[in-house]
Amino acid sequence: MSLLHIAVILPLIFALIIPILYRFFKRIHLGWFVLPVPIVIFIYMLTLIKTTMSGNTVMKTLNWMPHFGMNFDLYLDGLGLLFSLLISGIGSLVVLYSIGYLSKSEQLGNFYCYLLLFMGAMLGVVLSDNVIILYLFWELTSFSSFLLISFWRERQASIYGAQKSLIITVFGGLSLLGGIILLAIPTQSFSIQYMIQHASEIQNSPFFIFAMILIMIGAFTKSAQFPFYIWLPDAMEAPTPVSAYLHSATMVKAGLYLIARMTPIFAASQGWIWTVTLVGLITLFWASLNATKQQDLKGILAFSTVSQLGMIMAMLGIGAISYHYQGDDSKIYAAAFTAAIFHLINHATFKGALFMITGAVDHSTGTRDVKKLGGLLTIMPISFTITVITALSMAGVPPFNGFLSKESFLETTFTASKANLFSVDTLGYLFPIIGIVGSVFTFVYSIKFIMHIFFGQYKPEQLPKKAHEVSILMLLSPAILATLVIVFGLFPGILTNSIIEPATSSINHTVIDDVEFHMFHGLTPAFLSTLVIYILGILLIVTFSYWVKLLQRQPGKLTFNYWYNRSANVIPNYSEKMTNSYVTDYSRNNLVIIFGALILLTFVTVFSVPFNINFKDVSPIRIFEVCIVILLLSAAFLILFAKSRLFSIIMLSAVGYAVSVLFIFFKAPDLALTQFVVESISTALFLLCFYHLPNLNRYNEKRSFQLTNALIAGGVGLSVIIIGLIAYGNRHFESISKFYQEHVYDLAHGKNMVNVILVDFRGMDTLFESSVLGIAGLAVYTMIKLRKKRQTQGNEVKNHE
């Protein structure tokens, strides 16, 4: 096992260990035991920067099911390293922050178990080269995030938000599964790198469009893109460390990673470029507009996260245009990938810090309601400083890193508007317009975020708690992120050669020469647009109280949340009605539906599919076999007219013993002996149990019931006979019996073929059958124990009375 595999598995192992440690170390905050895990992974990832800078990659394989092409294959390139650094780096700061945020009285064992589970799953997503393994980790992120969002399960809003996120992201996960299966069909491989190398085969496949649509749905749901964004605001009910981790740097970025990783395969399609770009721009505009009207600090950050994700998504879509050009023209559009990667990093820094400050404000004042907050500038000066730095970065104000990536975004929209590709030159003007409008509202909600908390009148009478500056443990992590905001803004070269260029090259192998970010490029369209954004933003802030009321009057039926809630209520009701229409309290009705469907499917298949019934290889029927079958049928027939349970049991046993005799004649003595033992034990058990039951009562049935029963029974019998004859006479595959005959001794070291098949070749099947019997036995034992317990309690009550 390689170090790369250990880096992925380490959080998963500690996720199992941490709850045990929690039982023995109650006095020490559990976060201190968790903190070394992401730090160690982060340090290890830093050592791999030189590898990716030199253009090399790391490929490690751990065999799992090689025959099916499912191995634990890990592939690390510039893109995987970038996300791994974000996952482990931000994860370290979040764990440190959580030590100050969560008290020891919380269920810390559960919290850190879920957090580490999520961390390992995210590392698995961004490092897996096998798409099936990627999917497994992808779904594990949905499951672990569900547990984290519902951590405070006593709150109804937490349960609602967790269920909502799970439903939408799992829907996307199923779409992703369908997409990757369609990708694997033409390439006959589950390797992502192999798919990229054979992208032309996928592009010529009839499944190409369907795979593209399904994978985009998977990415859009995970990264909260329009119209799937509705789960993210409700997920804010999670503890603030969860919001800072999942919803700024990791989970919501998984969809962006998937789009970036799959771009070499799908960039040849105009549908990919248009859809990814327009969905991103629409998300940017819609979410930034909605962020301005939120009354909850986390609500503002939730919609701002959605809008920033839309911005990055749009840049990834624009960058895909580079696949349709050569040389310098290709590099011009590939610069959008560079801008996307840079903003990916910047967003993790300023948004992570803002979430942590929001948690600090909530921890200090007891509320996140902007109507109750205000005037905290002098009370929380350190928090104010961090907020100003990070919020201005989000607004795109120099000299912070957000300004550089926002300028790059605007530049890419103007570049895309000039692309003479797929009629982009006629509609491309929408790109910069939507980008500018979205950036205006981004500026507005960023500045208002500062004003809501720290300016205005201080209202202590409306605060549940007396406001105060929080502890150093809660300030250290956002302070580090705020420092990075300044450093990356003033010295972006720290990232360009080491992180950004290798990550960009992983998306498009076009060489990006001398990537540079500057505060001022001259009077470019992007710079002039920035001035327009500032002017319009200030005007909207000044008139905020007038126009925001119009947004808050949005009819409920025009929101996606309304239709989600309506569907969540209507679908279960219709499902229940449909289920009740064919699943009733009468077992006979249920059996009629089941057996009727079997008969219908059998005869439809018989009359629609050509087949042969071949009796050439059928062995001759001997007289004693006929006698045994007659005995068997007679016993089964007499059960129908039995007037006592004892007679029914005897006839049923006769059927079983008759089958055992057939096994003897067919030279299967062990099987016959087993059948004899089972029948004997079953008969004894039936007799013991039925002894305690009341007498058997027979009810006269209507002739219509009797006729229906006879038709169903006859139809099922005929169907089974037909299926058996067709299966015997139409062997499209070579019989496996020869394999057993040839290998029963050398592989299993047994001479009895039946025993070897049951115990060795089909050992798992036998094991699970035994497990089912064991579970049934436990259920019976539990029922008996409960009955005895109730009888004992009843006797105690009587004695007390």
From Swiss-Prot:
InterPro entries: CPA3_Na-H_Antiporter_A (IPR050616), MrpA/MnhA1/PhaAB (IPR005663), MrpA_C/MbhD (IPR025383), MrpA_C/MbhE (IPR046806), ND/Mrp_TM (IPR001750), Proton_antipo_N (IPR001516). Keywords: Antiport, Cell membrane, Hydrogen ion transport, Ion transport, Membrane, Sodium, Sodium transport, Transmembrane, Transmembrane helix, Transport. GO terms for molecular function: antiporter activity. It comes from Staphylococcus aureus (strain MRSA252). GO terms for cellular component: plasma membrane. Its main location: membrane. The keyword Ribonucleoprotein does not apply. The gene is mnhA1. The chain crosses the membrane at residues 4-25, 30-49, 79-101, 108-127, 131-153, 166-188, 208-230, 243-265, 270-289, 302-324, 339-361, 373-395, 429-451, 472-494, 526-548, 589-611, 621-641, 646-668, 672-694, 707-729, 767-784. Na(+) extrusion is completely inhibited by the H(+) conductor carbonyl cyanide m-chlorophenylhydrazone (CCCP). It is a multi-pass membrane protein. May form a heterooligomeric complex that consists of seven subunits: mnhA1, mnhB1, mnhC1, mnhD1, mnhE1, mnhF1 and mnhG1. Belongs to the CPA3 antiporters (TC 2.A.63) subunit A family. PANTHER family: NA(+)/H(+) ANTIPORTER SUBUNIT, NA(+)_H(+) ANTIPORTER SUBUNIT A. It is found in: Cell membrane. GO terms for biological process: proton transmembrane transport; sodium ion transport. It comes from the Bacteria. This is Na(+)/H(+) antiporter subunit A1. The lineage of its organism: Bacteria, Bacillati, Bacillota, Bacilli, Bacillales. Mnh complex is a Na(+)/H(+) antiporter involved in Na(+) excretion.
